Amino acid sequence: MLQSLQNTGIQARLTLNTYDKYNASVSKLDSSWKESLNKIDETLFSNLSIGISEHFIPTPYNQKNFKNMIFDYRSCFINNLSIGDPAIPYKTIASGGTIPCAMAMVYEYFILVNKKDKIFQTREELLLHISTTLVLNGYRTQYAGTSWISLDKILELVYGIPTKIQASIFNMCHSVASCNPVIALVPTSWLHGNPLLLSNEAILVWAIKNGEAIISTTTSDTLERVKVSTLFKNIKRSWACQIQ
């Protein structure tokens, strides 16, 4: 697994330098996304009815429901016993698990729609496996954004779900119309209406109907609806997910 990551140009142990190289490789996609925002047509979105039926969307993975799961750059495990008082407190899924929860949601969706046998018997077991894989392959809480690279590579290399960074709002609409769930990173401040929240949060875009996007977040048990043009303007980067 580590060798596979290295062969893609991503070092097993990610650093800020690795992150800079990754950003440079996708900067053109980010630029084209921003340019496409100038072509937003509200009337177009109001007439769209595309995407995955709510009937097929799994219950969202709410990271708040996994407070007993440790997940940071050192390890990932179920915390049934006291771990003492480390110099740097351990983080839990509840406070830092937005990306693994989004990845788990995508994985469960494809298992359901393709009617495949479950490899993981519980949601907690799946989330623990994803989180452990992230930690072992370079996720580092000290380095902002390294989890973006991990998401990009691990969904495909480990779970067989290729991802493609969306280069424009039209790319994304096409992906949604093709019933490919899209993971998007948005400002936590916008998502929760609190300007004091400075991080990013992963959401999943499932459908676009009547000018609204149907999304799931990793901090709620239910689906939500947001104005699609506002959503597009707040997306930092997005990945369409599909099964080959």
Where are these regions (language model features)?
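Conserved active-site-adjacent core of cysteine acyl-enzyme catalytic domains
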Residues: 11, 18-20, 108-112, 117-244
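Active-site-adjacent structural segments surrounding the nucleophilic cysteine of cysteine proteases
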Residues: 4-142
